[in-house]
Curated annotation (Swiss-Prot):
Natural source organism: Brevibacillus brevis (strain 47 / JCM 6285 / NBRC 100599)
UniProt-recorded name of the protein: Exodeoxyribonuclease 7 large subunit
Gene from which the chain derives: xseA
Broad class of the protein's primary localization: cytoplasm
Basic and acidic residues bias locations: 439-450
Catalytic activity: Exonucleolytic cleavage in either 5'- to 3'- or 3'- to 5'-direction to yield nucleoside 5'-phosphates
GO cellular component, one term: cytoplasm
């Protein structure tokens, strides 16, 4: 045995892996079995064992594939898995690498149904507050279903019989099989792009659970939930319940029932219009009777018996209102006029600023001239005043008394004549340096010409 024929463990495992991956019968195959030892790792990858009564195989399903699963795998569930066989080099063990997985059998379908139902319910897609009201008088009714099935015939017949003026717009879709979910989603989106679609019917006729399974698809449910048009689900018969029924705004037991919910019956509305007409006539008659009675009461009232007086009162109120309006206008105009006057004065002051400056200069010159002239005039007056003071001082009685003369008073009055007193009267003689009191003993008049008497009086 040559040394070059000896393989390492790694080389051997790598070769086994290469052989397995090149074998066409081990690639892209379906395997049925029961799930056990299921683990959903934090990385998102799934690890489990697929077994039957005689054997088992380890299975790996990476997160990039298992995120598309329509159900949550668990131990004991039967499943059909699509994938390929390969080897894990480190352990030298072959295992099945899954790319797709579906529940196997009706029990698994029911499990997938319940799991999706719970998931969407937790997201609030079934909440009553999300449900929208259907339009009462739709003009265009959209339908998503098979163009060749009985459902479209039942819907068209019912709508044309009940409400012939409504237009039916069909968006054809595959309603069963592997291609059905994508086809239904596409048809719903196409219908949402159409103008003026008032209500949308999504459904099909009856069938087995497998045939109806497209309406339990998560993508279909989300397309219905996000539709801008109110949706009526109509899948199968009354006993058939799908995820689409929970998500739709209204659930109909059959396609025929969906058509009846979508449009009103014209005879029902004819009867309703007739009833409304009767009610309207009654209301009009009642209103007319009430207004007629009111008119009669008004005609019999005091005010209507003397309309001239009412007109006079109204005219008086009008005159008063007119007077108040004129007064208000006058007051307003006065205020505006006063304001404009103030503004005009302010403007004038601003315009006269330069003139005021010029006048101020002229005034300064005039003040200087006036001061000069007044000073000259004041000097003249001062000199004249001094001359008059000198004259007055020369003529002053005090000056005369300083030369030896005196003033005689009787009863506080200056004596100018001997006729003012008689012998025995008390007199006061005022001299330049004081005064003296004397008594008259004798009065000599000038005409008596007595010698030795003094000219203006006799001394005591």
């Amino acid at each position: 045995m040559a040394l070059q024929d000896i393989l390492s463990v790694s080389d051997l495992n790598r070769y086994i892996k290469l052989v397995l991956e090149k074998e066409p019968h081990l690639q892209d195959i379906w395997v049925r079995g029961e799930i056990s030892n299921f683990t959903h790792h934090s990385s998102g990858h799934m690890y489990f064992t697929l077994k039957d009564k005689q054997s088992r195989i380890k299975v790996v399903m990476f997160a990039s594939y298992n995120r598309f699963l329509r159900f949550l795998p668990k131990d004991g569930a039967k499943a059909i898995v699509r994938g390929s066989i390969s080897a894990y080099e480190r352990d030298g063990a072959y295992q099945f690498y899954a790319k797709e997985m579906q529940p196997d059998g009706l029990g698994s379908l029911y499990l997938a149904f319940e799991q999706l139902k719970e998931k969407l319910a937790q997201e609030g897609l079934f909440a009553a507050e999300r449900k929208r009201m259907l339009p009462r008088f739709p003009k265009r009714v959209g339908v998503v279903t098979s163009p060749t099935g009985a459902a479209i015939r039942d819907i068209c017949t019912t709508i044309r019989r009940r409400y012939p003026q409504a237009e039916i717009v069909l968006s054809p879709a595959v309603v069963q099989g592997a291609d059905a979910p994508a086809s239904i989603v596409s048809a719903i989106r196409i219908m949402n792009d159409q103008p003026d679609i008032d209500v949308l019917i999504v459904g099909r006729g009856g069938g087995s659970i497998e045939e109806l399974w497209a309406f339990n698809d998560e993508n279909v449910a989300r397309a219905i939930a996000t539709s801008l048009i109110p949706v009526i689900s109509a899948v199968g018969h009354e006993t058939d319940v799908t995820i689409a029924d929970f998500v739709a705004d209204v659930r109909a037991a059959t396609p025929t029932a969906a058509a009846e919910l979508a449009v009103p019956h014209y005879l029902e509305w004819v009867e309703r219009v007739r009833q409304l007409e009767i009610r309207m006539h009654r209301a009009v008659r009642g209103t007319m009777t009430e207004q007629r009675n009111r008119l009669t009461r008004l005609g019999n009232s005091y005010a209507m018996r003397q309309p001239e007086r009412r007109l006079e009162e109204a005219a008086e109120r009008l005159d008063r209102a007119h007077l108040r309006m004129r007064q208000s206008m006058k007051h307003l105009l006065d205020r505006r006029r006063e304001r404009y006057t103030r503004l005009d004065e302010q403007i004038k002051r601003y315009r006269l600023a330069d003139q005021i400056g010029e006048k101020r200069k002229n005034l300064s010159k005039l003040r200087a001239t006036l001061d000069e002239r007044m000073l000259g005039r004041l000097n003249q007056k001062r000199m004249a005043f001094a001359a008059r003071i000198a004259t007055l001082e020369a003529l002053s009685p005090l000056k005369v008394m300083q030369r030896g003369f005196s003033l005689v008073y009787t009863n506080d009055r200056l004596v100018k004549s001997v006729e003012q007193f008689a012998p025995g009267d008390e007199i006061m003689v005022r001299l330049s340096d004081g005064s003296a009191t004397a008594r008259v003993e004798k009065v000599n008049r000038e005409e008596e010409k007595q010698s030795g008497s003094q000219k203006n009086g006799t001394r005591d």
